[in-house]
Design a protein with these regions (language model features):
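Flexible, low-complexity charged segments
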Residues: 1-133
Length: 133
């Protein structure tokens, strides 16, 4: 019993020490860096016509402050990459009459955007709509 208590106390002291070291770092090192993209709207193609529109709003989480600054300067290129991935997704998987597979879209966008810029930690979907025509 005493050994279990000592193990628990040791584990708690390690956790407390790691929290104290995290608190001693500057707030800018702890805060994630976010860069917002304007809304992207792509057509949803049916068999012979446009069935609706897919509308998505994205926020990029950068690895660091420097990466966030670089993302802001490369915004046209990143927006073009996101638009291409959204078009491909809407062509293959979207419908104006069914729910959007946000998990698949997130995976596709993350893969495409991370290839375009390695400073992107992840792509967050903050708004997603599929609107029938």
């Amino acid at each position: 019993m005493r050994k279990a208590v000592n193990t628990a106390i040791t584990a708690l002291s390690v956790l407390a020490a790691s929290d104290a070291s995290a608190a001693s770092r500057p707030a800018t090192a702890l805060a994630p860096q976010f860069v917002a993209l304007s809304e992207i709207t792509t057509p949803i193609f049916g068999e012979s016509r446009i069935e609706g529109a897919l509308s998505v709003t994205l926020v990029l989480e950068a690895d660091s402050v420097g990466a966030a600054d670089t993302l802001r300067t490369r915004m046209p290129e990143l927006r073009a990459t996101a638009l291409t991935a959204a078009l491909e997704f809407s062509r293959l998987y979207a419908s104006g009459y069914t729910p959007v597979d946000a998990g698949r879209l997130s995976a596709d966008l993350n893969a495409a955007m991370k290839r375009a810029h390695p400073g992107i930690a992840r792509v967050l979907i903050v708004r997603l709509d599929a609107i029938p025509a």
